[in-house]
């Protein structure tokens, strides 16, 4: 078994959809077995996004790496067995099953910087850009195509130019009233 005396970052493959529960389970097992000195952070890199379903705004979580959990640990026989004993953990990524390789500090810093950029404010799940073509799917302009002129993420609204009888008409629409082409 490979031994490391420094806490390094490893990637665990997990059942998709269970990443949060696995991370919590690892934290609980570490406390229960008094192995805090061998483990650092356990994280599931994600951000909050706002979805609009049936006209209702709903916050949901978007995982950057679905099916994976990042864990900071000192790799030895007991820490390896603790992690592998957690239900729904498929194994470590990189190296061999009994000799996992840590990810580089550069890769970890890239992930952490991305998490810092995200911030606390949830972003819309669908991002629109001026000049992009969208299709109106609700309201009086339903089934018309239009070009996005302005985007207001605070109010979840778009200003779209819709061509009606050969003339371009600006229309304000909610995010839920349009879909990307």
Curated annotation (Swiss-Prot):
KOW domain sequence ranges: 130-158
Keywords: Transcription, Transcription antitermination, Transcription regulation, Transcription termination
Domain of life from the UniProt record: Bacteria
InterPro entries registered for this protein in UniProt: KOW (IPR005824), NGN (IPR047050), NGN-like_dom (IPR006645), NGN_dom_sf (IPR036735), NusG-like (IPR043425), Rib_uL2_dom2 (IPR014722), Transcrpt_antiterm_NusG (IPR001062), Transcrpt_antiterm_NusG_bac_CS (IPR015869)
GO biological processes: DNA-templated transcription termination; regulation of DNA-templated transcription elongation; transcription antitermination; transcription elongation-coupled chromatin remodeling
Family per similarity comment: Belongs to the NusG family.
Protein name according to UniProt: Transcription termination/antitermination protein NusG
Species the sequence originates in: Buchnera aphidicola subsp. Baizongia pistaciae (strain Bp)
Taxonomic classification: Bacteria, Pseudomonadati, Pseudomonadota, Gammaproteobacteria, Enterobacterales
